[in-house]
């Protein structure tokens, strides 16, 4: 289970709370939609879960373990994330290398890495884009590459 437990978030001390005493939990395999108006904190919740932001108070728990102060690179072992603007995260020379970047940094090599990339590309119908430069793709194709990158990491959440 992945949880936000009584989390309060503000961008800096002295500024108003963006989120106040929020508690949410996510079970493995559960699909959750966080909806609301612009600026209501949807992206902030995902940034807190992934470690891209730190709460002012409260905890982020992974199977009961406090991971609040862990870096995003540590949390990427169990949390996958697709950015709203995927072109901001793409910097590899080919789609295949872009998709392989995360699993490679998780320690996957050789056949294990190739299998993760091939499966993610098949699941997102991006095989034909394998040798393309990600930043020149259409926004829709960039989004599919970003989804493939998250899938290739084979995270729990």
Feature locations, PLM:
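Conserved ABC ATPase "signature" region
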Residues: 111-129
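Conserved ABC ATPase signature
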Residues: 133-137, 141
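Conserved ABC transporter NBD signature motif
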Residues: 58-66, 75
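A short, flexible loop at the N-terminus of ABC-type nucleotide-binding domains that lies
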Residues: 1, 9-21, 28, 69-71, ...
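The feature captures the beta-strand-to-loop junction immediately N-terminal to the Walker
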Residues: 35-37
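Hydrophobic anchor residue at the start of the ABC signature
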Residues: 147
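Helix-to-loop junction immediately C-terminal to a conserved catalytic motif
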Residues: 50
